[in-house]
């Protein structure tokens, strides 16, 4: 069974933003000969996450507000006591971003059927930047026959 590993690179915007990476995943699958199998999508960062949900602008705004309520940036967090940690000079104050990421997931597995993602009508693969702006990578592993 062939296994193909690829990366998706994303330049994110400040703060929290959500990117629909479904088109890039579809493009990667189309570039292979795999017709039936699965694709693993994995976020390689501790302040990013993935989810499968509807890519609707107002819902995405609701999700951002919901995440900010779960871990407000203005709250006090031990991780943000940079003077008590051995950190690089450019270390951001971002405990809230780590906590938001913990409420989501770092990976999704989606079936491939007849060369296409087996997503539902309103489903998209969403990449969550929780501590932007940054250059991010998403690991994609396509396997099957």
Name the predicted role of every residue range.
Residues 1-145:
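Active-site histidine-anchored catalytic micro-motif
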């Amino acid at each position: 069974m062939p296994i193909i590993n690829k990366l998706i690179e994303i330049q994110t915007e400040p703060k929290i933003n959500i990117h629909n990476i479904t088109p890039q995943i579809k493009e990667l699958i189309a570039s292979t000969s795999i017709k039936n199998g699965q694709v693993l999508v994995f976020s390689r960062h501790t302040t990013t996450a993935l989810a499968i949900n509807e890519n609707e602008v107002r819902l995405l705004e609701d999700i951002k507000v919901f995440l900010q309520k779960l871990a407000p940036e203005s709250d006090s967090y031990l991780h943000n006591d940079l003077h008590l940690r051995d950190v690089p000079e450019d270390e951001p104050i971002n405990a809230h971003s780590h906590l938001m990421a913990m409420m989501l997931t770092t990976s999704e597995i989606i079936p491939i059927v007849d060369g296409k993602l087996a997503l539902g009508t309103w489903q998209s693969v969403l990449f969550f930047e929780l501590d932007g702006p940054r250059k991010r990578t998403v690991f994609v592993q396509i396997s099957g026959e």
